[in-house]
Amino acid sequence: MKAISSWHVGVSAEAYAAAIFARYGYDVSVQYGANQPEYDLIATSGDLMLKISVKGSQDGSWGLTQGYKKGCDYHTATAKWLAAHHKKTIFCLVQFKDTAPNEMPRIYLASPVEIAERLNASAGGRGETILYENHTWGPRAAGSGTTDRIPDEWMISAERLAYMFSTYGQ
């Protein structure tokens, strides 16, 4: 399938995220309008609420910390990115790469701290601004021969959702 615009990726990612939370039985509220600060969705379970920032991608990666990189190393950029995000906001990472329009994308849930740990470990520990779903570094790269991969436990599931609500629910 040909690539779609970043706007279509974002709208699709938010719609899939809202749908999957609802499908698991959570109440979902969607923010509409210009980019809202910090989060795109709110999901509730009883008295617990999660603020959810949705990030969509169609290339196997999510660029997250580039805006913090100017004049510093990857680890400092990641620390700045982490400081800018509330620790109770979770990320819903939606990946459309290698999916047909009528197929579900892969969906992952992670906290800012979990993402920062992956970014810092990326490229053999050098760090990176991009979170990769599954990327092996080539022979000329800083992390030559290493593979960055989203942990399997981040894949959305009833267990992952229960963990997120019990750990990060407000």
Predicted regions and their residues:
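Mixed-charge (Asp/Glu-Lys/Arg
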Residues: 1-37, 42-170
